[in-house]
A protein has these predicted regions:
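Catalytic histidine-centered segment of alpha/beta-hydrolase-like enzymes
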Residues: 239-250
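Conserved alpha/beta-hydrolase "acid-adjacent" motif
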Residues: 215-221
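Short beta-strand/loop motif that positions the catalytic acidic residue
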Residues: 202, 208-210
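Active-site nucleophile elbow and catalytic-triad environment of alpha/beta-hydrolase enzymes
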Residues: 182-198
């Protein structure tokens, strides 16, 4: 299986590369996602074959990447080097980065810590500032507290919160996550503070995609889009955080392609 090694701490990061001569796009999913989920995401489906080279990456702590149980291993300066290690492994200088939720926050981190490797960012369902107490953050904390040998309690907490039943195959993948790694990831994220600062000085194009009903992150996402010199905010009507995560809205696909092609 293809892995890249993070030079800062030796963490092994799993990736899948579609290859070809197109412009590379690194894609990350959400808090429970593996590359198997990311391949099915709206961001992935938006990429015309041949025009772009999709590189799917498992977050540290998820999928086939290493899963340390120490919260310190999930510091943003370390996490931001994970996809850069993948680019180095593939001999790629610069790429677009597309991420949703947990992946959107990582996108802000990459923009902060490795802007010279970024063509454009698409950050969905997230914001770069410190985490605020909100209904969703309380759901994640409570769900993780209840997890034992797998992530079933967190998956069920999400289903109750969004009043959905996740697709069978995706649900099984999510449940199979390592709860100790998830708790370490979450503990560090809540304690760490901003994923990125000095947004007014950024030169990287950044599309922020939010559900108009995402009460947890919308205000801060609007603030970030206003601060970024090349920032743009796309609101998906009648979508909460989860609905935006799985959206295949034409406006989303058009905005993603416009952002990537213009960079």
């Amino acid at each position: 299986m293809p892995h890249a090694k993070n030079a800062l701490d030796g963490a092994r990061i799993y990736f899948e590369d579609t290859g070809g001569s197109g412009i590379p796009v690194v894609l990350h999913g959400g808090l429970l996602d593996s590359v198997d989920d990311v391949r099915e995401s709206a961001g992935a489906r938006a990429l015309p074959p041949g025009e772009f080279r999709a590189v799917y990456v498992d977050h540290r702590g998820l999928g086939r990447s290493d899963k340390p149980h120490d919260p310190a291993a999930y510091a943003m300066p370390l996490r931001a080097r994970d996809p850069i290690a993948v680019l180095d492994e593939l001999g790629i200088d610069r790429a677009h980065f597309v991420g949703m939720s947990w992946g959107g926050r990582l996108g802000f981190g990459v923009g902060a810590h490795a802007p010279d490797r970024v063509r454009a960012l698409v950050c969905g369902g997230q914001q770069p500032y410190s985490w605020l107490d909100s209904p969703l953050t309380r759901v994640v904390t409570g769900g993780l507290d209840d997890c034992q040998h797998d992530a079933l309690a967190l998956v069920e907490a999400f289903e109750r919160f969004w009043q959905v039943r996740f697709p069978k195959a995706q649900r099984a993948r999510w449940i199979d996550n390592d709860p100790q790694a998830l708790r370490a990831m979450w503990t560090r994220a809540l304690a760490e503070g901003p994923a990125a600062t000095n947004l007014t000085e950024w030169t990287v194009p950044c599309l922020i995609v939010m559900g108009a009903g995402d009460a947890d992150f919308l205000d801060q996402a609007q603030r970030a889009a206003a601060e970024l010199p090349r920032g743009e905010l796309l609101l998906l009507d009648e979508a909460d955080h989860y609905a935006a995560h799985v959206s295949a809205d034409d406006a989303l696909i058009e905005a993603v392609l416009r952002t990537l092609r213009a960079a």
